[in-house]
Amino acid sequence: MTLPEFFGNRYHDEKKILLGISSAIIVVFFLVYTASALASGGKLFNTVFGIDYHVALFIGAAVILIYTFMGGFLAVCTTDFVQGTMMLIALLIVPIIAWGYVSGDFSSLLAQSGVNSEHYMSLMYNGDHAITPIEIISNLAWGLGYCGMPHILIRFMAIKNEKELRKSSVIAIVWVVISLTLAVVIGVVGRAYLLPMILGETAGAPSTESVFIQMIQETFTNKINLPFIGGLFICGILAAIMSTADSQLLVCSSSVSADIYQIGRASCRERV
């Protein structure tokens, strides 16, 4: 059962209006969402291996499409577990090592970040200006909306019983808090760690999208000569991209093949 189908059954949508609207929303917006994940994969290969962006984009999309369509929901869930583990290890270890090279305490870390603003770590400021109510609402919608995303909810719909459902809810929230907190830590530590590259404005100077990649390369190439370990952590970034893209692709394809097809078939029967 897909999420639009659940809503249709729950609210007795005999005319399939709710089914059609929810399916259309998923297909349109998840195609864009999936495209952004695939674009991130292309940028990763382009930054690490120097492969042409469009070629890298095609390779990443092909790999994800193959195992998603061949294995379906089971393949996506299995690979997501492995990919999530790799991502968590990378998020934990890389900033800790980088922090060790920058400083030993948080205050000196901020001092070495090269930011003069007193509101750098304030939740109520965006740069030097206070955030507006619209920005607060937008940020809350972005964060809280994660819990209602279709590619997340289908995991809960597949759980065996109510007891496991409650346990899974706790695990999911803890995972979100840990991963998003570590993502913020990477940004703060990465700015201080890569400050010489940023100030030098060299060809390899990191953009905001490649800070984590540059942290891994700088640590395991220039600081610690363990390129194999660095490669594994870069795989953690790839795992994050793939685990998002395959889940969204599965939800999108399910909406097309099950929900939209069901509406079209019913329309054809009425005409006949």
What is the role of each PLM region?
Residues 1, 8, 52, 85-231:
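Loop-to-helix junctions at membrane interfaces in multi-pass transport proteins
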Residues 1-68, 141-145, 237-246:
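Helix-loop-helix module between adjacent transmembrane segments
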Residues 5, 248-259:
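Re-entrant/interfacial helical elements at transmembrane boundaries that shape
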Residues 9, 43, 47, 100, ...:
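Transmembrane helix-loop junction
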Residues 10-20, 254-271:
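Loop-to-transmembrane helix boundary motifs in multi-pass membrane proteins
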Residues 14-18, 52-59, 222, 226, ...:
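Membrane-interface starts of transmembrane alpha-helices
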Residues 23-27, 61-65, 83-87, 91-94, ...:
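Residue-level recognition of pore/gate-forming positions within transmembrane alpha-helices
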